[in-house]
């Protein structure tokens, strides 16, 4: 049995029938005894960041569909721990979340680009169980 850890990429089976994960690549962000959490990397949402967050018209970052769980939640992964405190490490270079106001400030000042940070609506969750 293979172990899954943060930073692992899962590629969907080509014959998978679940439309949520059809032709998907999922980045595992957290894995422990109670389940696994990740984000679908390759499904861009039809709306941009400013369509979801009112009053922030100057931020035109794309948003990605992270998965079918909690579609009313906004998450982000980034490569700027020096500018965004509090992120959880996924790999040595990639972090999940952190101080949202610091992320917005970095974007507004041009220190953070779409190459450095991605927003996700919803997330993917696999729950562990035993038989």
Language-model features: locations:
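A short aromatic-anchored loop/beta-hairpin motif
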Residues: 1-120, 124-131
């Amino acid at each position: 049995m293979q172990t899954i850890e943060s930073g692992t990429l899962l590629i969907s089976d080509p014959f998978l029938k679940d439309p949520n994960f059809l032709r998907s690549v999922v980045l595992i962000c957290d894995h422990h005894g109670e389940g696994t959490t990740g984000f679908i990397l390759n499904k861009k949402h039809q709306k941009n960041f400013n369509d979801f967050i009112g009053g922030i018209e100057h931020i035109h970052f794309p948003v990605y569909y992270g998965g079918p769980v909690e579609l009313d939640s906004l998450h982000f992964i980034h490569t700027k721990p020096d500018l965004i405190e509090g992120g959880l490490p996924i790999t040595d270079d990639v972090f999940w979340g952190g101080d949202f106001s610091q992320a917005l400030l970095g974007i507004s000042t041009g220190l953070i680009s779409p190459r450095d940070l991605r927003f996700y609506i919803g997330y993917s969750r696999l729950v562990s169980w035993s038989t």
